[in-house]
Amino acid sequence: MNKIISNKIINNNIIFRNNFNNLFFIRNFINNKNNNNNNNNNNNNNNNNNNRNKKLKYSPNHQWIKISENKDFATIGITNYVSDIVNNEFNKILKIKLPKINDKIRLNQPFLSIWTKEEENIQFKSPLSGIVSKVNNKFNNQQTTTISTKTTTTTTKIKPKLPLKSNSLFFNNDQDSWTIELKINEPFQTNHLMTEEEYAHYCENTDYK
């Protein structure tokens, strides 16, 4: 993981900027690349594309979004790209805080806060508006473990970590990687969200094919 990414955290509310911050440029680049590939290779399909989750969208602040088929719920999680950075490049995560069930969340409202020793508060902004219907409590605060012997009882704090399932940029939609579920109660647009291919270029992942 590129260590200079951590230096791109700007202020305390803007997270993980990178050089590919112009989504219009990325989409034009991908369209041109795909057109060239189609012209040169009409009969060759990339098998990897068949295995990718076309239903997931990605936000500029490194969250994945899965919208239900009837479009009334959205599950939101953190991608491996940013999870790996936070886990490996910050010495200590002090606290992780999520909203409560029934909280109203607006588009671009900070809803997930991570306090670290180096950065006072890293915040993730919501990619959609809605009402919190579920919360993944595995993200909330520190946990403790207690070990008892015949003579002593020791309570140890477990260092909080963001879930990381693979070396991929992307999270699978599993029980550990999601943060909240939103009940969507108003019309919404997804033009500001990225496909997997767009997100890979946004993260400057040259290995994506």
From Swiss-Prot:
Disulfide bonds: none annotated. Residues 35-56 are annotated as: Disordered. GO terms for cellular component: glycine cleavage complex; mitochondrion. Gene3D superfamilies: 2.40.50.100. Residues 35-51 have a biased composition (Low complexity). Coiled coil: none annotated. PROSITE patterns: BIOTINYL_LIPOYL. Residues 73-159 form the Lipoyl-binding domain. It holds the Pfam family GCV_H. GO terms for biological process: glycine decarboxylation via glycine cleavage system. Belongs to the GcvH family. This is Glycine cleavage system H-like protein gcvH4. The gene is gcvH4.
